[in-house]
């Protein structure tokens, strides 16, 4: 599970606990790769402490904020599993869906399982406006419906290896 983390000191321990418990209870072998994206708070201290005390947790630390996509790529380069799930540290996406994604991947011949929000939930109206505007512009310029796109997804190892082999790192998940 790749977990980009920026100023998430209030979420890291809960995320680790919830996701670890969920995967353990479902008999899924796992590692949690927390990538600290140059946080200004205690995020890295908490990740380091968790990693020292739990063999399932790995931490990657950036010296400054490089952005979520860079953190995702660092996690993909670090992860060793047969599949990787991208998950926000604030658990904005329900972690229980990881089990559904895993089962779809395990029982079908698919390389990517995409998560999608049913609703945007509560968010700042200004953020919501600009987000909707951004996706409208992207959709119009690309001819693709990107509004439903999400970085909550499961990637098969073959996909991870292909992404890691690409020289481009400024991508949009």
Show the residue positions of the predicted features:
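A conserved acidic beta->alpha catalytic loop
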Residues: 36-45, 91
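Acidic helix N-cap motif at the loop->helix transition within catalytic regions
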Residues: 10-14, 41-50
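Short, well-formed alpha-helical segments that are part of the catalytic scaffolds
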Residues: 8-23
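Short beta-strand/loop segment that forms part of the nucleotide-sugar
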Residues: 3, 20, 28-38, 60-61
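Acceptor/aglycone-binding surface of glycosyltransferases and processive sugar-polymer synthases
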Residues: 49, 58-64, 68-78, 83, ...
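Short helix-capping segments at alpha-helix termini
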Residues: 23-28, 50-56
